[in-house]
Swiss-Prot record:
It comes from Kocuria rhizophila (strain ATCC 9341 / DSM 348 / NBRC 103217 / DC2201). GO terms for cellular component: cytosol. Keywords: 2Fe-2S, Amino-acid biosynthesis, Branched-chain amino acid biosynthesis, Iron, Iron-sulfur, Lyase, Magnesium, Metal-binding. Homodimer. GO terms for biological process: isoleucine biosynthetic process; L-valine biosynthetic process. Its EC number is 4.2.1.9. Pfam families: ILV_EDD_C, ILVD_EDD_N. This is Dihydroxy-acid dehydratase. Disulfide bonds: none annotated.
Length: 612
């Protein structure tokens, strides 16, 4: 029978000092021997997805205490990728994922906590906490802050619901007046919560449901809706319940590595492919799998992408649907249910709330014919339509669900947008270890695209060339030296893609990079090219004017230059680490240099390699 980890500091004469300190935090003699549940919060006033989380730790703590545990809250950092976008602040975004993972590990292990509740939400926070949870392998429940509501369109400019990406792309549209742009800016992000499309934050929070580590509705229940409160309370109760099962009954099925098995990772990636999630999820899922010691790699993702169809197109892949519409259509259980009916789901995996995925979907998939009344009511939660930074501030409901499997937000396998899914992996002579593209954001006529290489060596240079209108129809912008090591930090390229879209080149050009893309990216954008240029990857050999071929259907990304010429170029570069040909105006701190010295390319999840 496993002993409470916290017993290390709460039992024995030699721990009198530690107990004295515990007492100073509010614990009493009656608390020693109860499971200590660490609550990893990520409240910050910098990030709309986290601005409402200040009191959420106390809410979870109340449920922990009521269930017989002892709650101890701490905080992690949280970077807003949108605010950090387009300048050197983005160098810190991906590295912050590892800082978050380490900080959770440090706090939990230093204080010998028995279980963990992760209160996450935005882009790097959920992945960082996920990596930590799988590294620690103690009972854990995830609960995120929830998605933002989408914004009202602007008459005469955009008739559809708007979000952050609309504000970015329309900023370079010369037909949009300053007054109209100001109105779009006002409307784009109306409430607290993670940005309203199927961007990275919402994608990752949805994937925690499929992994089995969060509760039904975690990925889609709006931050503003009162229904979200029950998720926080239930997370606290479940954490104590799991802790008691493990420490009192020796039930290892509640541990995160018992839940997030290879089959669970396959489910999560199948969901991601079906819903056309952010390409960043590939990076984070690969990193999480390594922490879980699960053999799951790009080849597995490639195989899944050939089997799993695209069942949903949510912003930025569509102007019709946002996360609130996914919720109305039944949320993640509905997408998983469609995969289940298509024979594309592992039903026997465990979750933190149900014995199996199959049992969970029986109750929560509103399209199954077996769903409970509580589940049906839960998925009627609607936006409030009022600007606010307050959680649980409204209780609006839709009149009915969207269960249109042919033309609604979530389609059936029979009515899929495409036979193959919304994400896929490309290989070729400039991506020997792979590259990732979000096909859900591309018109099928662009699945085969050949163009001229327009080579730049930084995101800043790409933005300058695009806004200077030097990039023309038929060009493929190649941004090298922006990978995990070369950036360092593997910047997101939302501004270049948004500007191409705003200038009317979104369907006439392509962009490829060893960097990555925001979850808000759509269009012919290929990222995560591995190996990266700074690691000697052939993307660093591409020259201006080279012909590049993109063949999505055959999973090919190549430069049409013969092997002998590529070998000559490689020899010319020499054996020293490759760097941009001209200096970049970029201050790289010691912290970033330390990150660059340890980080791997994207095909490995951009994890750090540390010698044992």
């Amino acid at each position: 029978m496993p002993q409470l980890r916290s017993a290390t500091s709460t039992t024995g004469r030699n721990m009198a000092g530690a107990r004295a300190l515990w007492r100073a935090t509010g614990m009493g003699s009656e608390d020693f021997g109860k499971p200590i549940v660490a609550i990893a919060n990520s409240f910050t006033q910098f990030v709309p997805g986290h601005v409402h989380l200040k009191n959420m730790g106390e809410l979870v703590a109340s449920a922990v205490q009521e269930a017989g545990g002892v709650a101890k809250e701490f905080n992690t950092i949280a970077v807003d990728d949108g605010i950090a976008m387009g300048h050197d602040g983005m160098l810190y975004s991906l590295p912050s994922r590892d800082i978050i993972a380490d900080s959770v590990e440090y706090m939990v292990n230093a204080h010998c906590a028995d279980a963990l509740v992760c209160i996450s939400n935005c882009d790097k926070i959920t992945p960082g906490m996920l990596m930590a949870a799988l590294r620690l392998n103690i009972p854990v429940v995830f609960v995120s802050g929830g998605p933002m509501e989408s914004g009202e369109g602007v008459e005469g400019v955009v008739e559809h619901r708007v979000d952050l990406v609309d504000a970015m792309s329309l900023a370079v549209d010369e037909s949009v007046t300053d007054a109209q742009l100001a109105q779009i800016e006002e409307n784009a992000c109306p409430t607290c919560g993670s940005c309203s499309g199927m961007f990275t934050a919402n994608s990752m929070n949805c994937l925690t449901e499929a992994l089995g580590l969060s509760l039904p509705g975690n990925g889609t229940t709006l931050a503003t809706h009162v229904n979200r409160k029950r998720l926080f309370l239930e997370a606290g109760r479940r954490a104590v319940e799991s802790a008691k099962k493990y420490y009192e009954q020796d039930d290892e099925s509640v541990l995160p590595r018992s839940i997030a098995t290879k089959a669970a990772f396959e489910n999560a990636m199948a969901l991601d492919i079906a819903m056309g999630g952010s390409t960043n999820t590939v990076l984070h899922i690969l990193a999480a799998a390594q922490e879980a010691e699960v053999d799951f790699n790009l080849s597995d993702i490639d195989a899944l992408s050939r089997q799993v169809p695209c069942l949903a197109k949510v912003a930025p892949n569509s102007t019709t649907f946002h996360i609130e519409h996914v919720h109305r259509a039944g949320g993640i259980p509905a997408i998983l249910g469609e995969l289940r009916r298509g024979g594309l789901l592992n039903e026997d995996v465990h979750t933190v709330h149900s014995q199996t995925m199959g049992e969970w979907l029986d109750e929560w998939d509103i399209r199954s014919g077996k769903a409970s009344d509580a589940a049906k009511e839960f998925f009627l939660a609607a936006p409030g339509g009022v600007r606010t930074t307050q959680a649980f501030s409204q209780a609006n409901e839709y009149e009915d669900h969207d269960v249109d499997a042919a033309g609604g937000c979530i389609r059936s396998v029979e009515h899929a947008y495409t036979k193959e899914g919304g994400l896929c992996v490309l290989f070729g002579n400039i991506a020997e270890d792979g590259a990732v593209i979000k096909t859900a954001g591309i018109d099928p006529e662009l699945f085969h695209f050949t163009g001229r290489a327009f080579v730049v060596e930084s995101q800043d240079e790409a933005v300058h060339e695009i806004l200077s209108k030097n990039v023309k129809e038929g060009d493929i912008v190649v941004i090298a030296y922006e990978g995990p090591k070369g950036g360092p930090g593997m910047q997101e390229m939302l501004y270049p893609t948004s500007y191409l879209k705003g200038l009317g080149l979104g369907k006439k050009c392509a962009l490829i990079t060893d960097g990555r893309f925001s979850g808000g990216t759509s269009g012919l954008s290929i990222g995560h090219i591995s190996p990266e240029a700074a690691a000697g990857g052939a993307v660093g050999l591409v020259q201006h004017g080279d012909e590049i071929e993109i063949d999505v259907e055959n999973r090919v990304l190549r430069v049409n230059v013969d092997d002998a010429e590529l070998a000559r170029r490689r020899q010319e570069k020499g054996d020293a680490p490759w760097k941009p040909t001209k200096p970049r105006e970029r201050r790289v701190s010691k912290a970033l240099k330390a990150y660059a010295s340890m980080v791997t390319s994207a095909d490995k999840g951009a994890v750090r390699v540390v010698e044992d």
